[in-house]
């Protein structure tokens, strides 16, 4: 049964960092975190939010890290994209075990594991109330999953990109290291690019700017944050024109 609530963002693209799925572990997927996120998503779906999800792969393999150690960059990025498929399948499993109908769609065809990404089919899944998890990034090397998240948000005409991380917004420096880090409540795309803030890569910010797609950065581990985001309540950092 769906609740009638004053939803500001009817269709959302949720970008989950792979590192956040580790929880307090040093590698891989923390099942407790996975189940928590599934519960938060289930609440969004019950509200009537149409949700697309892009998951990173930093908990398993990061292409840039492989390239920095001498690997061919395209090969390393391909490995990273495959790692996102693993995370996407884990997320799909957690959601379906919680009763949320979910479809994983991969930008790299692998029909025996999940659907191939087709924009019109993805949109139809969303219209039917299914959560769609977009795996394998953009399907091309040299693009981060942050850029993939913004790209998919534009393609499905999402109202907002919500980047869920381990911190409660955007700071002028890493709050995990610096106690005097200052949090921003609101930023413009140009602020992010000019200040070199580590929100997401410049390509993703530029893509959002071109389409005037708002980005919200919030702490994934705080219960109710994603619900607040959908309702338009102030949480985390909002990035707009």
Swiss-Prot record:
The positions annotated for binding ATP are 15-18, 58, 62, 165, 171, 174
The UniProt note on how this protein's activity is regulated states: Inhibited by UTP.
Q: Name one GO cellular component term.
A: cytosol
Task: Kindly give the Pfam families that the UniProt entry links to this protein.
Answer: AA_kinase
Task: Give the binding site residues for UMP.
Answer: 77, 138-145
Give the EC number. Answer: 2.7.4.22
Q: What class of enzyme is it?
A: transferase
Question: Which pathway does this chain act in?
Answer: Pyrimidine metabolism; CTP biosynthesis via de novo pathway; UDP from UMP (UMPK route): step 1/1
Question: Which reaction equation describes what this protein catalyses?
Answer: UMP + ATP = UDP + ADP
Please indicate if the UniProt record lists Kinase as a keyword: yes
Its annotated compartments are: Cytoplasm
Please give the biological process terms from Gene Ontology that the record holds.
Answer: 'de novo' CTP biosynthetic process; UDP biosynthetic process
Q: Name one GO molecular function term.
A: UMP kinase activity
The UniProt record lists the keyword ATP-binding: yes
InterPro entries from the xrefs? AceGlu_kinase-like_sf, Asp/Glu/Uridylate_kinase, Uridylate_kinase, Uridylate_kinase_bac
Main localization (coarse): cytoplasm
Keywords of this entry: ATP-binding, Cytoplasm, Kinase, Nucleotide-binding, Pyrimidine biosynthesis, Transferase
Q: What function is annotated for this protein? A: Catalyzes the reversible phosphorylation of UMP to UDP.
Q: Which family does it belong to?
A: Belongs to the UMP kinase family.
Spell out the PANTHER family in the cross-references. Answer: URIDYLATE KINASE, URIDYLATE KINASE PUMPKIN, CHLOROPLASTIC
Quaternary form? Homohexamer.
Q: What is this protein's name?
A: Uridylate kinase
């Amino acid at each position: 049964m769906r609740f009638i609530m004053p939803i500001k963002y009817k269709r959302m693209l949720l970008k989950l960092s792979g590192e956040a799925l580790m929880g307090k572990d040093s590698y891989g997927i923390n099942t407790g975190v996975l189940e928590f996120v599934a519960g938060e998503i289930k609440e969004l779906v019950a509200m009537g939010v149409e949700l697309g999800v892009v998951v990173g792969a930093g908990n398993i393999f990061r292409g840039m890290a492989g390239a920095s150690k001498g690997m061919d960059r395209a090969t390393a990025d391909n490995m990273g994209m495959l790692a996102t498929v693993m995370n996407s399948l884990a997320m799909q499993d957690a959601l379906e075990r919680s009763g949320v109908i979910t479809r994983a769609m991969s930008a790299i065809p692998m029909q025996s594991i999940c659907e191939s990404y087709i924009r019109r089919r993805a949109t139809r899944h969303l219209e039917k109330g299914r959560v769609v998890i977009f795996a394998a990034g953009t399907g091309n090397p040299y693009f981060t999953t942050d850029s993939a998240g913004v790209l998919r948000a534009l393609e499905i005409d999402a109202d907002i990109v919500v980047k869920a991380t381990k911190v409660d917004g955007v700071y002028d420096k890493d709050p995990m290291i610096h106690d005097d880090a200052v949090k921003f409540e609101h930023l413009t795309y140009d602020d992010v690019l000019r200040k070199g803030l580590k929100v997401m890569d410049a390509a993703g910010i530029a893509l959002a700017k071109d389409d005037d797609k708002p980005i919200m950065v919030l702490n994934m581990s705080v219960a109710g944050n994603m619900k607040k985001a959908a309702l338009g309540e102030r949480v985390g950092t909002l990035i707009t024109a």
